[in-house]
């Protein structure tokens, strides 16, 4: 448990006030102290290291600060996603909420890896965030291979046609299904739901969160800060054995406006 979770739990128990009163009342002195301590402790959660997740990392394979166009110059956008760089962050959205979009990291990563990035919601009204990983063509082609069909952000192009991958929806607050109660891991092609866990990023949260994705052989885990929301072992019953090396992409639905920074991927040691 990181300090944020410990303090947040302890403060609310100690003060014995409803959470909504603590966070919204301008006349409640404990509320001001609570918000300050939670904000400080929350920033400490973002400083978590790989060892905090009971996994041994080997080499840092890739990193991008995501704070400038130069830092993501080789990334590939599919669909009408727009990027803006400010205050050390990369904001991503679709102007006028036109269409969904997918942003591919240029590197191909090994089967076993740990990825981390930070993100913060800029539009609390609606949105949905997905990470694709271990992504290749059906015959293990690179996802950017010119022989594969063109893609423009339409969901079926990523989960039902010419690609195989895993994907996790870890923030889900769409107009048709607001504040969805679960995070989902699917194995593609086929949109096969293989695991459902507790909700990911809280739909009311406007603070920065660290996302940690770990694929260790057949074992897949995803954390929001220090909170485990996906924990599944691929037994090969869906679409054959565990997927191998492939690319990672960040997907947003058309209503979504998040900002991102500090994307990193490590390989894992052989003794995990």
Residue ranges and their predicted role:
Residues 22-35:
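Bacterial N-terminal signal peptides that target proteins for export
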Residues 34-43:
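Bacterial N-terminal signal peptides
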Residues 49-77:
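Extracellular carbohydrate-recognition regions
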Residues 66, 115-117, 207-216, 220-222:
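Short tryptophan-centered beta-strand motifs in secreted/extracellular beta-sheet-rich domains
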Residues 82-99:
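Short carbohydrate-recognition loop motifs
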Residues 96-183:
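Secretory/extracellular carbohydrate-interaction modules
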Residues 186-210:
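Short, aromatic/His-centered strand-loop micro-motif at the edge of beta-sheets
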Residues 233-261:
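Flexible glycan-contacting loops in extracellular carbohydrate-active proteins
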